[in-house]
């Protein structure tokens, strides 16, 4: 009996070691796959009310630029996305009158080359730089004001509020705005053509209300008229004297 126990003991020990080894060798749970690259268009499509903005991002290729930069830059990016209603509320012809270059500027004006959280926008130093710039390489900026529950953004030409956030996680923030951000540098009053003054008449005349030009009488004209009257009176006097002598 004792011999049997001694024989089984090593076998039990070996079995325990094998079980422990098998438990240790169990494959670990697979690590979660890394998230794919950030895609601005996909974020906007999920929002469901940005068809016009997506179209403009595509035709200007700004969307592709944002995707490349946001996936490679340490600074991140911030996008202000106008809704379809915002574009519908524009004055008719606003977009059509823009050249292709100005359309690119307009869309770049809705992109900042840095990540800003909502808290950042409340305390940021104005103006906040955007991706748009003028012919003199002057950067177009945005100004932010507000409180915790509401943040307003101003272009110097229009002002609206940030109504929602589609994404607020580094390296990309996407905020919804209720108006298209029209830069003052492109749409401000100083860009309107001034009214041309009425042209002066070359003859020095005076223009009446009907638009016709009346020539002003010059001093020489007045003196010439007086001389004609004097000469005519003198001639009539001579004729009267001659008639008296004859009769």
UniProtKB/Swiss-Prot annotation:
Lineage per the UniProt record: Eukaryota, Viridiplantae, Streptophyta, Embryophyta, Tracheophyta
Matches recorded under PROSITE patterns: FAS1
Keyword entries, A-Z: Cell membrane, Glycoprotein, GPI-anchor, Lipoprotein, Membrane, Proteoglycan, Signal
Its biological purpose: May be a cell surface adhesion protein.
Propeptide intervals in chain numbering: 225-247
Domain FAS1: from-to ranges: 37-181
SUPFAM superfamilies listed in its UniProt record: FAS1 domain (SSF82153)
Cross-referenced InterPro entries: FAS1_dom_sf (IPR036378), FAS1_domain (IPR000782), FLA_A (IPR045003)
Subcellular locations according to the entry: Cell membrane
PANTHER family: FASCICLIN-LIKE ARABINOGALACTAN PROTEIN, FASCICLIN-LIKE ARABINOGALACTAN PROTEIN 9
Superkingdom, natural source: Eukaryota
Region (Disordered): 193-228
Gene Ontology cellular component list: extracellular region; plasma membrane; secretory vesicle; side of membrane
Protein name (database record): Fasciclin-like arabinogalactan protein 9
Residues in the signal sequence: 1-25
Residues the record marks as carrying a glycan: 39, 58, 71, 143, 152
Membrane topology: Lipid-anchor; GPI-anchor
Biased composition (Polar residues): 209-223
Family statement: Belongs to the fasciclin-like AGP family.
Residues bearing a lipid moiety (GPI-anchor amidated glycine): 224
């Amino acid at each position: 009996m004792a011999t049997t126990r001694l024989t089984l003991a090593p076998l039990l020990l070996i079995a325990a070691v094998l079980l422990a080894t098998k438990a240790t060798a169990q494959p670990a749970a697979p690590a979660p796959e890394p998230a794919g690259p950030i895609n601005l268009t996909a974020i906007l499509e999920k929002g469901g009310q940005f068809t016009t903005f997506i179209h403009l991002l595509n035709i200007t290729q700004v969307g592709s630029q944002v995707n490349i930069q946001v996936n490679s830059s340490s600074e991140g990016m911030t996008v202000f996305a106008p809704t379809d209603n915002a574009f519908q509320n524009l004055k008719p012809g606003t977009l059509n009158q823009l050249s292709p270059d100005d359309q690119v500027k307009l869309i770049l004006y809705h992109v900042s080359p840095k990540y800003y959280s909502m808290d950042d926008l409340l305390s940021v130093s104005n103006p906040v730089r955007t991706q748009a710039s003028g012919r003199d390489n002057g950067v177009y900026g945005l100004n932010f004001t507000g409180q915790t529950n509401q943040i307003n953004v101003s272009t110097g030409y229009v002002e609206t509020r940030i109504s929602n956030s589609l994404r607020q996680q580094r390296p990309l923030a996407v905020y919804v705005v209720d108006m298209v951000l029209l830069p003052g540098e492109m749409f401000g009053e100083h860009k309107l053509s001034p009214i041309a003054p009425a042209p002066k008449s070359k003859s020095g005349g005076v223009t009446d209300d009907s638009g016709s030009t009346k020539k002003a009488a010059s001093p020489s004209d007045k003196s010439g008229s007086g001389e004609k009257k004097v000469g005519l009176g003198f001639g009539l006097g001579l004729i009267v004297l001659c008639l008296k002598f004859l009769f």
